[in-house]
Regions:
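C-terminal flanking tails of non-heme Fe-dependent oxygenases
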Residues: 18-207
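Non-heme Fe(II)-dependent double-stranded beta-helix
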Residues: 1-27
Length: 207
């Protein structure tokens, strides 16, 4: 859900989840600060100092999502999440001890060893486009577990739909586009082809 809704405690009064509301608010606030700090560090590593992420990624545009993956006897043939890249700037993921997250590297799927005491940071499509390809959005998936259910929580650093994404270096690898345009193209591709095409749609050479 959008982070701004988590800050609205009235959302939880009907369910009497006051303690949950407080915990989620603290968690979302902490992850938001961490995400902005990481975005700043990554951009400064490229020699680019900017308030861009502070100005575009606000509480009403970022998301916190809690995921539950039921046990599945057909595992690993059944995915909890199909292979994809994240359509944001940064994702901060916390997973339990069950495991199931896999990243693709050199054409092979590599399992990420679960560590409940650690956070996983994913570069998203928007950061790849903004950094002009310096940072890469890695394809990942979730495989189910035969015997145990899996839980994870993800924070997505997202801009408003009207935010223009432009490469910060010249010559640009990707053309300028808004977050709304990107999301609409992803949805259209999934509808027409059954999968996300993503950033290749926005390469300068493709237009």
């Amino acid at each position: 859900m959008p982070w701004i809704l988590i800050l609205d405690s009235k959302l939880y009064l009907f369910f009497s989840f006051d303690q949950l509301s407080t915990t989620m608010e603290q968690f979302a606030t902490t992850l938001s600060e961490l995400a902005h700090k990481l975005a700043r560090i990554l951009s400064e590593k490229m020699g680019y100092k900017s308030k861009y992420f502070r100005e575009t990624c606000l509480p009403n545009t970022c998301y916190l999502r809690m995921n539950r993956y039921p046990a599945c006897p057909l595992s690993p043939q059944v995915f909890g999440l199909m292979p994809h890249t994240d359509s944001d700037f940064l994702t901060i993921l916390h997973q339990d001890e069950i495991g199931g997250l896999q990243l693709i590297r050199d054409g092979k799927w590599i399992s990420v060893k679960p560590n409940p005491q650690a956070l996983i940071i994913n570069i998203g499509d928007l950061f790849q486009a903004w950094s002009n390809g310096v940072y890469k959005s890695v394809e990942h998936r979730v495989v189910t577990n035969k015997a145990k259910e899996r839980f994870s929580t993800a924070f997505f650093l997202c801009p408003s739909y009207d935010t223009e994404i432009r490469s910060c270096f010249e010559p640009p690898v990707y053309r300028r586009f808004t977050f709304r345009e990107f999301r609409q193209q992803v949805q259209e591709d999934v509808k027409n082809f059954g999968y996300k095409v993503g950033l290749p749609r926005f390469l300068v050479s493709s237009h």
